[in-house]
């Protein structure tokens, strides 16, 4: 992990419970910092990002589809719903837990989950939240999202956030994050940034020189300073053609990567309309890669 991954500044969570049972996180910013506010400490913390899933809400293959991608025997062409695992030697953080979460985690070592970051409330990003139950045997799990997503989680999964939990339900602590606040999960520093999923405000997340953004259609220019210095970008790219009202296409993702100035970019949240993985990768410019399920990258 880059030096920016560890901050010299300590960020404290406001642990005061609100009447809704959602713990709010007070915004905290380092003094004198730039847009991202990351430390230039010389400390290093190695980390790995594993793509647990790289597909859209339908996954790939798509039920009922007989296109060459959906019939492909190449494992790179099979995509579970989008999710990722960020790990250092001490800390494990999940980004989104869709309906394939159980299947995605079976090949992974069974170790404590220190935090769960949710980008937004859509089912393909939260439908597997009940499947974190086994990990709660290792300790409660802190869940982080924007305020609207926290409200949606309480509405959609009320039994997980009731005042009096019955035996066997996940033990989750829900935290509403303000945009651009800095939090520390173990030795991982996290900064949420605002993204527009069509008309829906959602979160992308920055971790030092890594940024993870999915389901984006647009981003306000005011958010760009919070991505300054990002070297590895993960961003959604639905397909090559036919504009979508709430997701960007591959050409838009490539242009966004150039605006950010990322050294390398991995495209995720991909449909079968991207085409066969090997052929589609050849169409991409240098430094832009199609992510695939199970891919691990050092960050």
Region annotations inferred by a language model:
Residues 30-33, 228:
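A generic alpha-helix propensity feature with a strong bias for hydrophobic helices
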Residues 218-299:
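Cap/insert and terminal regions of metallo-dependent hydrolase folds
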Residues 2-30, 37-213, 222, 279-299:
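Binuclear metal-dependent hydrolase catalytic cores
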